[in-house]
Amino acid sequence: MQFSRVEPRSQLALSFLFICCSIKPALAHDHFNPLSLENDEPGVENVDLSVFEKGGQAEGTYNVDIYINNTSVETKNIAFKNKKSADNKLSLQPCLSVEQLKQWGVKTENFPELKNDPNGCTDLSLLAGAVAKFNVIGNRLDLAIPQIALIADPREFVPTSEWDEGINAFLLNYSFTGSQDHDIDENRTENSEYANLRPGINIGAWRFRNYSTWNHDSDGQNSWDSAYTYVSRDIEFLKGQLIAGENNTPADVFDSISFKGVQISSDDDMLPDSMKGFAPVIRGVAKSSAQVTVEQNGYTIYKTNVPAGPFAINDLYPTGGSGDLYVTIKESDGSEQHFIVPYASVPVLQREGHLKYDLTVGRTRSSDTHSAQQNFAELTALYGLAGGITAYGGIESTLSNDVYHAALIGTGLNLGDLGALSLDVTNSWSKIKAGDVVSDTLTGQSWRIRYSKDIQSTGTNFTVAGYRYSTKDYYALEDVLDTYSDNSHYDHVRNRTDLSLSQDIIYGSISLTLYNEDYWNDTHTTSLGIGYNNTRHNVSYGINYSYTLNADNSQDEDDDTEDSNDQQISINISIPLDAFMPSTYATYNMNSAKDGDTTHTVGLNGTALAQKNLSWSVQEGYSSQEKATSGNVSATYNGTYADINGGYSYDNHMRRLNYGVQGGVLLHRNGLTLSQPMDDTIILVKAPGAAGVPVNNETGVDTDFRGYAVVPYASPYHRNEVSLDTTGIRKNIELIDTSKTLVPTRGAVVRAEYKTNIGYKALMVLTRINNLPVPFGATVSSLTKPDNHSSFVGDAGQAWLTGLEKQGRLLVKWGPTAADRCQVSYRIPSSPSASGVEILHEQCQ
């Protein structure tokens, strides 16, 4: 229950009260006599207003945003007590435990005098210079703590003490799609259905996951398959994950392969964003207390204050690409130092001192039932050295025999103005199988080079990655396994080149992609793409060209494989129609292929409903080759309980009706909650009784009829803020707090619990048995719902109460003795007020 100002007369009385309480003392202590309230209310007795008289506020628990040195750290409930400061001023001070201070980065071990009192509170004044200021109106608690008492954590650092393993739960993601195809030429109708299920179980820090699929069609196919099954958990001290079951190896060093076994690998999501990816360490020396500013490509990307002496900045956000860093040190006397730190990056580069690792032991696996399997082990590591250098390498080997061994060593370099480069070499020792004959050990080498460069002055960015297998006897592990399979046809790659280039121009940008791969059997594949795209006045348009060639240059007369190539050019335009139809776009696409067929497609697409959770599309097309039209219409609804989609399409030969539903099921201690499709890490919203409340920034996610909802994705090991939108909620619902911050571990189901006040709202006029109003400032609390917040009595005995039951009893107190209290029995009328607020007159006895 909460106090609310309801009448002008009440507002005047309260204003007068607080003005009187805020007047500074002159020669004597000012005292506000509560009997002065008797002007309007004869018989009002002496009410204890000493706290307000001294400039204090009501003690209790407040939901506050906590800031340390102007940096937001958490939102939570904190208990406050009125305490006197050194200058004898009364103010609300927080009850903070030693554990909370440690969680927020205070070096509590350096201050042994910090201890919790019997109420679990410590004396913040024991930290020299520490000050707590509470803004009651803004619900903000500011803690000013000397820098020397704080751990120097990188930006957005989250201590492991905040990590939440979540609740025990059963999860199920499901997807079902179906279609009915009618072949006009053969007058035949076929039906097909597909489903996938992704069940999971969370128990403590352990996660069990499975992925299974089902296929059914009119030809009688009815099959279940399991794509993977594994259990996992995080290992905090290794900053990594343990996985046992079916998974894939990372592709940082060797090519990724599927396996069944055990894997321990680093998890970079455990790092704050400012420590992920690659960025150089900036070192310098400040002559005095100074401000350091870092700029890249004309933008300020970092600013901090440093004391006099040497400093190192190691928590720059990775910006991608390249572009030198311009550093300015502004001294306290206004003088400045300037220097440049070269910066560029390729995928393998790691921050100085950071180790990325993977250890896998298991058995290879493949969806191809004919593929051979081998026990194997793989170990890879990448380590960031000083000077923008990264050393990396790995070993990969079969265990039960000498079928395959490989070792790789390489280095990555930040070359500054010259870009970024990585170079590695792999040695392999292989025994391949030809027919029934296993070869002797074949030794081969492969060199790989990757390069990236961003030329800011011309707006050019390009990345080239070239693989060259220098000897014919080099094999990757999967190449060797292919020779042992029942279907022994495989392509033995000789070299591969990838090129990606983009160039900004006055209006838009031009892009170029090139992929070329050739094999030792003299076949090769080439793919080329060129495009121009631009957006002007919200109108997007572009033109793209693609070319693909599969060529066979071998001299094998028995091989009747023909060269094949394909060329396509397309034009696309998208125009917003907000002036006529909000959230709607008109589109046009033209596609012309080498065979002479040109298709033109026009359409409308957009979103609808208040939360934009209904997307729709209508298209009509024409083919010049067949001189026939085609079309389709589709819609997708993102609902609280599931996503539903459907569509219909047609052309000269086929009519197709398709439909689908995707969603999630979460079984937890408080029951069962349906949701949209869930990611691996999710948040359960618990607001008991608050039905139909939207979750901010989550399309279509509202609380269900019990007050529960699932936020279908969350960032593991990072702070996730979940807030509820209270605009338009039902009149009998009150949310005591609306925002929570949570830090889930990977795969966790964390619960965001909101305290609710469900019930009737009333403006209650309280009188005593002598028919005089209950004293101003008295507190009102529920005897039948003790969890409800207390309220205060205003002028003329008026109290604003929320969360009331149909009938109940209230306790009213205005002093410390038994004579200073009474009880009220009330009943809400059988026909509630249309406004949602009841006006009640009750006697307190």
Model-derived features: where do they sit?
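Transmembrane beta-strands of outer-membrane beta-barrel pores
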Residues: 149, 178-182, 205, 214-218, ...
